[in-house]
Amino acid sequence: MTSTNPVVAEVIPAETSTDATETTIATTEAGEAPEKKVRKAYTITKSRESWTEGEHDKFLEALQLFDRDWKKIEDFVGSKTVIQIRSHAQKYFLKVQKNGTLAHVPPPRPKRKAAHPYPQKASKNAQMSLHVSMSFPTQINNLPGYTPWDDDTSALLNIAVSGVIPPEDELDTLCGAEVDVGSNDMISETSPSASGIGSSSRTLSDSKGLRLAKQAPSMHGLPDFAEVYNFIGSVFDPDSKGRMKKLKEMDPINFETVLLLMRNLTVNLSNPDFEPTSEYVDAAEEGHEHLSS
């Protein structure tokens, strides 16, 4: 019996072929795999907006200035939101990584409870490893053919290892005067240029010059490595004399370089990895004495 009521006819519309097809597919899938949940269709609520060349240039400039501070990048670009900027940045970083281009990619920001906060600082263990005990030279004294350092050289090595700067008068004695006092109570200071070649002279007032004379020598330019390594070689030469006099006559930068290398040498020689080399030296010395006899 067909209803003649027009309202009822509008409420029950005729089923289209598309709806019938979707219903059939859903019923078939449900019958084959009833335990599988049907995923909800993904709908794009907002269309993606393309980036203009000017906006992309602003984005690249903001990356150089603010790294991954998206809020500041948003304010700098002006026409994009943080969500759009982060999405654009993700695609840009993947493109750079894929193409291997030399572009600025800021490092990822640290997590709140990161084990190594960004930027990473030098660990305390690495700094503590430099402060080694002065008992190591006594172990080195047992090496064949080794001449013990005198008291002055041992004191300098103690300065290098401990990192403790001696009083001003002792430092002046070791490094020499850095400034010269003229006859008119004017002090002339000579310092190397930034490139390490040549020097520049200027005259200072009495009060300012005296303050500079009491300060520790500044490190400028490059050390004379020939002089530095010649001195370190003389430390192991039993016939070498006047080592302290050579140290006093050195430039401050050469003096500091000698202390640094002697400290590193002390640490390396005291390393357990050096023991096989020490045993080899002992065996070679015994073999040499046997052949000589």
Swiss-Prot record:
One of its GO terms (cellular component) is cytoplasm. Residues 188-207 are annotated as: Disordered. GO terms for biological process: circadian behavior; circadian regulation of gene expression; circadian rhythm; entrainment of circadian clock by photoperiod; regulation of circadian rhythm; regulation of leaf development; regulation of photomorphogenesis; regulation of photoperiodism, flowering. Disruption phenotype: Monochromatic blue and red lights have opposite effects on the period of triple mutants rve468 lacking RVE4, RVE6 and RVE8; lack of blue light-specific increase in expression of some circadian clock genes. In long day conditions, rve468 plants have a larger size and a delayed flowering. In short days, rve468 plants exhibit long petioles. The keyword Transcription applies. Its main location: nucleus. The keyword Cytoplasm applies. SUPFAM superfamilies: Homeodomain-like. One of its GO terms (molecular function) is DNA-binding transcription factor activity. Residues 70-93 bind DNA. SMART domains: SANT. NCBIfam families: myb_SHAQKYF. Probable transcription factor. RVE4, RVE6 and RVE8 are components of the circadian system acting synergistically to regulate flowering time, redundantly to regulate leaf growth, and antagonistically to regulate hypocotyl elongation; their action seems independent of ZTL and HY5. This is Protein REVEILLE 4.
